[in-house]
Amino acid sequence: MRSHYNTDLGISHVGQSVKLCGWVNSYRDHGGVIFIDLRDRSGIIQLVCDPNDSKEAHEIASNARNEFVLITEGTIRPRGEGLVNPKLKTGEIEVVVSKLTIENESAVPPFAIADESVNEELRLKYRFLDLRNPKLYENFALRSKACIAARNSLANMGFLEVETPILTKATPEGARDYLVPSRVHQGEFYALPQSPQLFKQLLMCSGFDRYFQIAKCFRDEDLRADRQPEFTQIDVEMSFCEQKDVIKVAETFLKDIFKACGKEIQTPFRQMQYKDAMENYGSDKPDLRFDLKFIDVIDIFTKSNNEIFANIAKDTKKNRIKAIRVPKGDTIFSKRQMQRFEEFVRKFGAQGLAFIQVKKDGLKGPLCKFFSEEDLNELSKRCELEVGDVVFFGAGAKKTVLDYMGRFRIFLANELKLIDPNALEFLWVVDFPMFEQNDDGSYSAMHHPFTMPKNIDETDLEEISSIAYDVVLNGVELGGGSIRIHKNDIQQKVFKLLNIDEEQQKEKFGFLLDALSFGAPPHGGIAIGLDRLIMLVTGANSIREVIAFPKTQRAQCLMTDAPSPASNEAMRELGIKLRENIK
């Protein structure tokens, strides 16, 4: 029906006859000559409907309105002098229309396509209109290229694409499951998979050796800008491997994905232990596009005359005192900014934000009076302070200090405009703890309970580490993986440490324990969040910009009005009756 997409055309096509299809983006009547901006998925081109060229086409054009569907034929000509539009890919040319057809009319649209001021909820309600925006289309074109590149890259490395079940058994993986009632087995439920984790391990037990899948996953959790109830991941598993083998495979297909998206990245990525990431950056996914690394000064504060700081410094296992040096910060930050910094960290549990300024005549600030001159010199040397600098201090319980100082580090970087938006800083964070303590004192697996521990016989659960690894890009966790437990006795021991008794093990994981009893090979893998990856590549503000039909932050689809009530008949067939107070 068409000869070209709009942006396929340029100055080299002048004089050529074309046939184009698309929507009216806008129209203007200039003294009898009608100009129409025709939009297709690639972008916009200008149509010129002049009665001197075609009276019939001009008459039809006079009836066109925004979002009408047009089919047009005409000839490419260069725009007149001074009329070139550098904002358009086709800004040097226009189409002189000889034939025009209104293929379909449109109701008055609730907003102009590509109007960035439109409320997001309105855009999501009319998502089919929102997706007509060529900028959004470019996101999905890039997503398609990324998926094709991932498939080709993994296939070239000997991986087999295998689909795993969507209707499966509920297993504890950290978030709530979406449950699906069974009509045939009333009172029983399937769960939608939070990941293909157990099935891909079973495929390794089956001898498939190398598996991948671009998998849809489901988690019923609180939503944020980078979370959705259903999301997609590039899921990979391989047998007879070590951590370094999985990392090499992941770097290979990530490099191929970025190349397909027009970006070159360097491999291998740098690596950092989890402990170092937390102690130096206050995050297990540090953004390395800028410095502002923590400086450990707790030993110096043991000599302080300030009772609060001195008491904190006595317990180096439970407490931390960290410093962040900002070069020339004393010459940059106003008194009001310093107040804002303290207000910011207080939101995350800080009792305050101490600081020292470096003046020409020495160190200044309320803290200075609590140190001897020798200790101040040691502090200055440790922090490599220079005239004009300011150094901030966070002190208190380890978890709280690392958290708010990590957040403050990012806040400072944004204030100082230190972040290069075009930089791509990849990082592997390795050697994660096997377990983490919950607020109630119990322990849970930091990644998942199928991760291979390094020192399972250690009596202190917090000292057990795991063969787990996360890949981070610009401070965002792209994905994570681990070497898995492939021996039945070790898996049962991990379950026991998590207070999962033998009866629960058999009920929830009996099939996995059976598989591990029949000669399971060493295996490991990784999963990369496709939505987050494309969000970072495109520079989108939210993964909702790279998912065709996303949910809101309340897990609703405003376009289809899902979720919605089921009919009484459907509920009867499923054997389900709602409580009376459920609306």
From Swiss-Prot:
Annotated ATP binding sites: 219-221, 228, 477, 529-532
Name of the encoding gene: aspS
Matching Gene3D superfamilies: Bira Bifunctional Protein, Domain 2, GAD-like domain, Nucleic acid-binding proteins
Segment forming the signal sequence: none
Binding site for L-aspartate: 173, 219, 447, 484
Keyword line: Aminoacyl-tRNA synthetase, ATP-binding, Cytoplasm, Ligase, Nucleotide-binding, Protein biosynthesis
Enzyme Commission code: 6.1.1.23
UniProt protein name: Aspartate--tRNA(Asp/Asn) ligase
